[in-house]
């Protein structure tokens, strides 16, 4: 069946990609042809989505208890070969799909374009803003430059290729959490995941990390 958890819009085993196939965009404000905005959860296309999900549920393709299963519980079924398809985000390949492959080396997961409904020839997936948070400094702050200094220090410790201290601060291994999580500030390049995917593609084929460093080396080793 299709993996699904009770967080229907949470990126992991959710229904957003399924809804996009019907031209529905739950929790998005969608611009209409006349320039007005409509809330995506209230459109006729969303009603079609729910009807299709109800049909899957009634025919046994969805776990009867998905509404009480969080992501971790739903992932257990996937890892134990009880699911054959899921909608998810980029990190899904790292977890839980990798756990399933570790347990069942014959598992064969592949990415596909979002399947379209009969009424839709192509799908535009709903995506979030690349910038998800901002920092602001009060005009009454005695040392406003401290924010920039903190950000510079964060970049130096996590990203500097000469220091190459990413593993120490971000991914020490052995089940330990990286101390970067303790930082009061953080930032990332908006396209870092795309750049990492391109950078490690060839090394994964050859088995030679070459000059990879930092997060890209960590992803290669993972």
Residue ranges and their predicted role:
Residues 1-34, 82-94, 105-106:
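Extracytoplasmic/periplasmic solute-binding protein
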Residues 26-44, 117-124, 177-198, 202:
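Short, solvent-exposed loop/beta-turn-alpha elements that line the ligand-binding surface or hinge
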Residues 35-64, 113-120, 201, 209-211:
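Glycine-centered hinge/linker elements that transmit conformational signals in sensory
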Residues 67-76:
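Short helix-initiation/N-cap motifs at beta->coil->alpha
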Residues 96-122:
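Ligand-binding "clamshell"
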Residues 128-143, 162:
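A bilobed periplasmic-binding-protein/Venus flytrap-type ligand-binding module shared by bacterial periplasmic
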Residues 143-153:
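Short amphipathic alpha-helical coupling segments at ligand-binding clamshell hinges
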Residues 149, 157-222:
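Conserved small-residue motifs centered on glycine
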